[in-house]
Amino acid sequence: MSWWWAGAIGAAKATLKKFEEDETPKSFKSVGLVIGVTGMVGNSLAEILPLSDTPGGPWKVYGVARRPRPSWNADHPIEYIQCDVSDPNDTKSKLSQLTDVTHIFYVSWTMRTSEAENCETNGSMLRNVLRSVIPNAPNLRHICLQTGSKHYLGSFELLGKIQLHDPPFTEDLPRLNALNFYYHQEDILFEEIEKKEGLTWSVHRPAIIFGLSPYSLMNLVGSLCVYAAICKHEGKPLHFPGSKAAWNCYYEASEQFGIEEYGIVEGENRGLEEVMKGKEGVWEEIVKEEQLQKTSLEEVGNWWFADLAFFGGSAATQYE
């Protein structure tokens, strides 16, 4: 299976070609460092980059995440590094040794209770990584930073509360007059790349991302699958869990996801965060009956984000 087809159908679900012993190259032209390898994008990178027909590939891949390596990620042909990048000492100890890195893919983030805290924590995480790798990787050529559409819409706490630019949103629009950890990360990136001549960069700003990761804070597809499973288990109709505005508006996403079979019930203004209250036992029954990996409802459902996307005042819906 090729890298582009894997991406087109969802790399996480594809059965990808794995390296055989005699296929593994002795040296790699491209060496990727994926920060946040257990997230949706990081998990896909861990599958796609090592393929032989991936541009620049096959890549050697270092995958970094805070938690121990999960079983659903264990078959990816990468070198997994458990590292807390919010800890400068842990980051320097483990990442400064990666002297062969040519590309950094920074696809990690964490959520705090305020945007000021988001700026502080996420900025420190990125800075720790760059300061550990840039001085020690002589062949480092490019840094890819993933942020998102909140660059144009504002932080979660300000969605729908601040004046936005008129659409369409383009990369050269001035920043909004509000605190935003994406802006802070970009400033740190620009500051750090000046320390190495010839180092290039790119910033990617996707909107909703469809993919696989049980660890993602924003796994919309996974949450909807859990919602659908609970509806089926209880014999209830599968209604679209959002507003009419969210149903009708156009929205950019990185994979296709058909919702044609959903029904919209006029006047039912209940978000998934409310609907899923008290469903912990139902999910336990489903896990037992279907012999699924033991998880709690809280672990597999991100209801606040689903409500944000489909119902709870998302700024995107004002442009339907």
Give, region by region, the residue ranges found by the protein language model:
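N-terminal Rossmann NAD(P)H-binding glycine-rich loop of SDR-like oxidoreductase domains
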Residues: 3-4, 8-57
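NAD(P)-dependent short-chain dehydrogenase/reductase
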Residues: 195-248
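NAD(P)H-binding glycine-rich loop region in Rossmannoid oxidoreductase-like domains
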Residues: 69-128, 134
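Mid/C-terminal beta-alpha module of Rossmann-like enzyme folds, strongest
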Residues: 244-306, 320
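Active-site Tyr-X1-5-Lys
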Residues: 172-204, 212
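Conserved glycine-rich Rossmann-like NAD(P)H-binding loop of the short-chain dehydrogenase/reductase
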Residues: 53-70
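Conserved Rossmann-fold NAD(P)-dependent oxidoreductase catalytic core, especially the SDR/UDP-sugar
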Residues: 102-108, 117-181, 202
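Amphipathic terminal alpha-helices
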Residues: 1-20, 56-59, 254, 258, ...
